[in-house]
Amino acid sequence: EYAKFLPFIDNNIDLADLISEIQGELNASHLGSGYRPRGRDGDATAQLAFFPDPDHTGDGVRIAEIIEGSPLDAADSEIEVGVVITAIDGAAIGAGENWYPLLNRKAGEPVRLSLTDPGSGKSWHETVKPISGGKLRGLLYQRWVRSRRDEVERLSDGRLGYAHIRGMSDGPYREIYEEVFGRHTEKEGIVLDTRFNGGGNLVEALTTFLSGEVYFTAVPRGRVIGTEPGGRWTKPSIVVMNEGNYSDAHCFPSAYTGLGLGETVGMQVPGTCTSVWWETLHDGALYFGIPEVGYLDTNGEITENNHLDPDHEIDNDPKLEAEGRDQQ
């Protein structure tokens, strides 16, 4: 069926798509192929990390919000919300003009911004170093986490803590460990958000982390100052999950549910709790997945292609999400 396409495959991008189509016939997770070009000299738009005002109709770009950690978010900068960027490195920005090409390949390089404050009429210049698209995504992620944390704080009247685990690896685990036993150590319970987590291998560490039981209470001179274990969460928890959970991010809520550690809320997680080996070919750019290990859950059922339903199903309405409201 796929042989007819072979005469027309003359590059690895198309070959990866064809391999993915063929593997897709197996209807299993952790399959498919991809192409990672090795060259790093292509176009790359640097970022100033702010939200433009969509209602601005004049020349330049008016700033609606400066993202925390942005190159514009500096102690010695006069740039603030409402200021208009009129030119980048001397190139004027006309009304409605696509100004992003002016930042091509300029990540980490000094860039001169021409600025105007419509309120005061003041005009001036500042030099900043734009960041990469990857760093911008990191700042946006942290912005999202802060807003979720603030919402949990508000809705629980300060009684519950919140932590999001972005991946199943050592770094994200250290982040939530620090968050839970730092900011939230005195909270009555923890909301652990796993949404959009692409997986890894952390299910054992997380279930151990959340399954602590108090065996000692420290009481010097009659005053309670803490409990042991000190490195495991012993209070209630709840896990938020959605359709974006994958691989070990399915394994974890499945194990969490099977062990009776708490309840889950959100949307159905696809049955993708399977171990995989990603094989890279000799060119170093073309890779494909080889699923190797399936798992039986606490009910003796295979997790692959066996989805997990939440205890409390809540679907986020995209219209409300656009308003910044997270119903889950």
Q: Where in the sequence are the language-model features?
A:
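PDZ/PDZ-like domain segments forming the peptide/carboxylate-binding groove
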Residues: 43-96, 170, 293-294
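Active-site rim recognition segments
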Residues: 135, 288, 295-320, 324
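Beta-propeller domains
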Residues: 3-11, 44-46, 78, 94, ...
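Cleft-lining beta-strand/loop regions that shape enzyme active-site pockets
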Residues: 1, 64-65, 69, 86, ...
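A generic structural motif
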Residues: 53, 114-118, 296
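Extended, small/polar residue-biased N-terminal targeting/export presequences
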Residues: 4-56, 122-147, 327-328
